[in-house]
Swiss-Prot record:
<dbReference type="InterPro" id="IPR036477">
    <property type="entry name" value="Formyl_transf_N_sf"/>
</dbReference>
<dbReference type="InterPro" id="IPR044135">
    <property type="entry name" value="Met-tRNA-FMT_C"/>
</dbReference>
<dbReference type="InterPro" id="IPR005794">
    <property type="entry name" value="Fmt"/>
</dbReference>
<dbReference type="InterPro" id="IPR011034">
    <property type="entry name" value="Formyl_transferase-like_C_sf"/>
</dbReference>
<dbReference type="InterPro" id="IPR041711">
    <property type="entry name" value="Met-tRNA-FMT_N"/>
</dbReference>
<dbReference type="InterPro" id="IPR002376">
    <property type="entry name" value="Formyl_transf_N"/>
</dbReference>
<comment type="function">
    <text>Attaches a formyl group to the free amino group of methionyl-tRNA(fMet). The formyl group appears to play a dual role in the initiator identity of N-formylmethionyl-tRNA by promoting its recognition by IF2 and preventing the misappropriation of this tRNA by the elongation apparatus.</text>
</comment>
<keyword id="KW-0648">Protein biosynthesis</keyword>
<dbReference type="Pfam" id="PF02911">
    <property type="entry name" value="Formyl_trans_C"/>
</dbReference>
<comment type="similarity">
    <text>Belongs to the Fmt family.</text>
</comment>
<keyword id="KW-0808">Transferase</keyword>
<protein>
    <recommendedName>
        <fullName>Methionyl-tRNA formyltransferase</fullName>
        <ecNumber>2.1.2.9</ecNumber>
    </recommendedName>
</protein>
<dbReference type="GO" id="GO:0005829">
    <property type="term" value="C:cytosol"/>
</dbReference>
<dbReference type="GO" id="GO:0004479">
    <property type="term" value="F:methionyl-tRNA formyltransferase activity"/>
</dbReference>
<dbReference type="Pfam" id="PF00551">
    <property type="entry name" value="Formyl_trans_N"/>
</dbReference>
<feature type="binding site">
    <location>
        <begin position="108"/>
        <end position="111"/>
    </location>
    <ligand>
        <name>(6S)-5,6,7,8-tetrahydrofolate</name>
    </ligand>
</feature>
<dbReference type="InterPro" id="IPR005793">
    <property type="entry name" value="Formyl_trans_C"/>
</dbReference>
Length: 303
């Protein structure tokens, strides 16, 4: 099958690799190179780099909402468009430009976690089950019909990185199965029940509320690493907690109280045992290294 691929980050790489192996990728659309590092040199996105290595034409328009880009896509001889974490809204003219329309890999149990941050919200909400869906895109926000879906269980303390990698690889496999059977698949409309929205994360959301349960705070730590990071303030410094574990232990302390010299913190319910931290503008440290340089005393109440 002749494919136009639209994507940008690492999450989309396994799918593009599979498409290159099994189909004919006619063109790739990715976001424009961005300045990175101290030298602010322009760096290609992971998808742009992969397409470049395979000598596939790459286009990096600043928007899809103009006649020039729409006309370009219309001229490319392709049967289908695959869109994965591209970063731009796809207008109706492009959704309907090819015979089989536009397909999308969405890493959640739709209609739960529609939107920009399904992986993060899955972890933050403490979900123990999730899915990867192959969806035929329509004009709504992740409201299209489901062509193929695979459910799976999450371990209790699954990290964002683990979920990201699982969904990226599973999605790539499902995409190839979908394309192989696309003429025989009966699309399934999404339920109108159980709709939730996985809104884009904000930096402010990362601030830890010690009155929440230790379990909920642990979910936030795992779901917000690396960005924006779950953090607290100490001596006017922002400190991110990168790794912790929760203890379902009763206590009589005020929430936010440091109850041991190993940075165990009383929460609304339970205790959070911190294992890895990062102070702003400094490198990440395990708890022993951190406490050698920053002495947070027992009985301190964190904000």
């Amino acid at each position: 099958m002749k494919v136009i691929f639209m994507g940008t980050p690492e999450f989309a790489v396994p799918a593009l690799k599979k498409l290159i192996t099994h189909h004919e990728v006619k063109a790739v659309f990715a976001q424009q190179p961005k300045a990175k590092g101290r030298g602010l040199n322009l760096a290609k996105s992971p998808i742009h780099q992969l397409a470049f290595e395979h000598q596939i034409p790459v286009y990096t328009p600043s928007t899809l909402r103009n006649d020039k880009t729409i006309n370009l896509i219309n001229k490319i001889n392709a049967d289908i468009i695959v869109v994965i974490a591209y970063g731009f809204i796809v207008p109706k003219a492009i959704l309907e430009a090819k015979k089989y329309g536009c397909l999308n890999i969405h890493p959640s149990d739709l209609p739960r976690h529609r939107g920009a941050a399904p992986l993060q919200r899955t972890i933050i909400e403490g979900d123990r089950k999730s899915s990867v869906c192959i969806m035929r895109m329509d004009a709504g926000l992740d409201t299209g019909d489901i062509l193929m879906k695979e459910d799976f269980d999450l371990e209790e303390r699954t990290t964002l990185e683990e979920l990201h990698n699982k969904c990226a690889n599973l999605g790539a496999e499902l995409l190839i199965k979908t394309l192989a059977n696309i003429d025989n698949i009966v699309p399934i409309k999404q339920s109108s029940d159980g709709v939730t929205y996985a809104h884009k994360l904000t930096k402010e959301e990362g601030k830890i509320n010690w009155y929440e349960s230790a379990y909920k705070i642990d979910c936030k730590i795992r779901g917000m690493n690396p960005w924006p990071g779950a953090y607290f303030s100490y001596n006017d410094k922002i400190i991110k907690i990168l790794e912790a574990e929760y203890l379902n232990a009763e206590h009589h302390f005020t929430s936010g109280t440091v109850i041991s010299d190993k940075l165990e913190i009383a929460c609304g319910s339970g205790i959070l045992r911190v294992k890895k931290l990062q102070q702003e503008s400094k490198k990440a440290l395990n708890i022993e290294e951190f406490l050698r340089g920053t002495n947070i005393l027992k009985d301190t109440i964190l904000k």
